């Protein structure tokens, strides 16, 4: 994996810079184990865990409140997180300046971090292929930026 210079701003080089959160997490499942870092917006709390993402069950569910939550959970429920798909509106994919490994950040519309996923460095070639499929990271312009759109109703 080639180290990249982190961008000062978010710029996409992808031809189709959108996907659903469900599709993105589905693509990341085989790249584990993944370190998941969940940020609590507005609170001084961060939760980190390393998880075998290949075992994730991914599910979207409309709640009685009208919100749609995406859940990633292990079968034994020892690991589980929920994201409001209306709040998680953007994702960046690139190479971490800190770890020099793969990094995916799920962001709010104002750019605040909700979730950071660090796929396994042993799966760097697979992550690089995923980046290339999405247009590749431009070392001068930074990470790939994806708009996260709602999953179409079936």
Can you name each region flagged by the protein language model?
Residues 1-154:
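Eukaryotic intrinsically disordered, low-complexity regulatory linkers and tails enriched in Ser/Thr/Pro
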């Amino acid at each position: 994996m080639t180290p990249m210079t982190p961008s000062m701003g978010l710029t996409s080089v992808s031809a189709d810079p959108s996907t659903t959160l469900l599709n993105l997490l589905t693509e990341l499942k085989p790249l584990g184990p993944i370190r998941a870092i969940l940020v609590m917006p507005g609170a001084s709390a961060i939760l980190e865990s390393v998880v075998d993402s290949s075992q994730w069950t991914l599910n979207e569910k409309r709640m009685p409140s009208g919100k749609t939550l995406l859940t990633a959970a292990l079968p034994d429920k020892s690991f589980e997180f929920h994201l409001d798909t209306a709040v998680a509106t953007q994702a960046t994919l690139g190479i971490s300046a800190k770890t020099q490994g793969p990094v995916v950040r799920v962001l709010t519309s104002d750019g605040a971090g909700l979730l950071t996923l660090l796929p396994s460095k042993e799966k760097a070639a697979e992550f690089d292929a995923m980046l290339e499929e999405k247009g590749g990271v431009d070392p001068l312009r930074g990470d790939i930026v994806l708009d996260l759109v709602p999953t179409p109703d079936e």
